[in-house]
Amino acid sequence: MVDHISPRASPGPIRSSQTRRARKLRDSCTSCASSKVRCTKEKPACARCIERGLACQYMVSKRMGRNPRAPSPLDSTRRPSESLPSAGSEQGLPAHNTYSTPHAHTQAHTHAHSHPQPHPQSHPQSNQPPHALPTPNGSSSVSAIFSHQSPPPLVETQGLGGDLAGQAQSTLSSLTVDSEFGGSLQSMEHGNHADFLAESTGSLFDAFLEVGTPMIDPFLESAPLPPFQARYCCFSLALQTLTCLFPHAPLGCQLRLTDGEDSSCNLMTTDMVISGNKKATDAVRKILGCSCAQDGYLLSMVVLIVLKVLGWYAAAAGTQCTSTAAGGETNSGSCSNSPATVSSGCLTEERVLHHPSMVGEDCVDEEDQPRVAAQLVLSELHRVQSLANLLAKRLQEGGDDAAGIPAHHPASPFSLLGFSGLEANLRHRLRAVSSDIIDYLHRE
């Protein structure tokens, strides 16, 4: 009766429970806790202490943990796949506290039984972190993380401090992670940086594009881009007006000779000159009525436009050279490009054809054509006179603004003396054109 002892009377389980409670350690080692950084919770030494060469010690926890509870039906269904000890725990090697899947633990269990003394699997040197401990099932666990969309089940931690680590993992598992980004971030938290970088990131980017990329209307993708449009302002209007006043290339222009284009025969008539100058004066009046006219560069361009308009009026009236006033046919009106046939006084860019049958709305004879053209131009000079008065006001304002600016300062192209010279030159040119036309009419 005394020789046979029932197994239920053995105090073994009580001693093991007391021993497990007595050996319960904290989650963070002493070094990580003193530095207030997150510990990887690896035993016997964490990755941070191994990397820094520190002594990794885990102090005994003051809390004994929860009392053991009765196993639930849900635990009994998960117990066969979760309670398999890893090969690292059998050999005394630490195992990573990472999330895993039943498929991964099945592979780990197969390796543990087929190899009594397992060795770490051979991986490329670039995939192994320099501070990580070798784990037989690390590669399969990481690959299982990236290959499953559903949240991984809970894994019981083997070794020291299993209860408290299991509570921490159960808290983390309550957070819903329903994308591959969650698994990758959890793998990064547990120190598997090299394994995370070694995995293919194509599926991660595909998942991101499916969720975060907005849909683009196919019509918008196929729509052509709008044509380039230049900025329209007073400066662009002044440049366009000045360009229209130069329809012909000069006789000695190298570009005209290189391109082979001859525009000397495309002469303008008196009606074309009157119409073009009217458009130019309207554009100048619009520019001078804008606040942009206070700019010195724009005022300089306006002065050039008005001077060019006066040049075309003089050419239409036939008062540019003596040969034009004396005879109806001029050298500039011919299609000859030879400079020797044109006198030096008639080498001008404003070339007007003086042989039309119509001048304005009147049909005139060939003999009366120069006189009628001169009278028509003289009647149009009032436009230039009003522009000269308005421009003089703007030039005076620009000169007042430039009074305190040095002559070499880039804020204004001319000094006060330069603006005064522009006004004087413009008025002198206007008086010269009008007096030449009046003298020509008196001679006729």
Swiss-Prot record:
Sequence segments annotated as region (Disordered): 1-26, 64-167
Keyword Repeat: no
Impact reported for residue 431 to L: Abolishes interaction with aflS
Biased composition (Basic residues): 106-116
PANTHER family: MONODICTYPHENONE CLUSTER TRANSCRIPTION FACTOR-RELATED, OLEATE-ACTIVATED TRANSCRIPTION FACTOR 1-RELATED
Oligomeric form and interacting partners: Interacts with its co-regulator aflS.
Protein name per Swiss-Prot or TrEMBL: Aflatoxin biosynthesis regulatory protein
Organism: Aspergillus parasiticus (strain ATCC 56775 / NRRL 5862 / SRRC 143 / SU-1)
Gene that encodes the chain: aflR
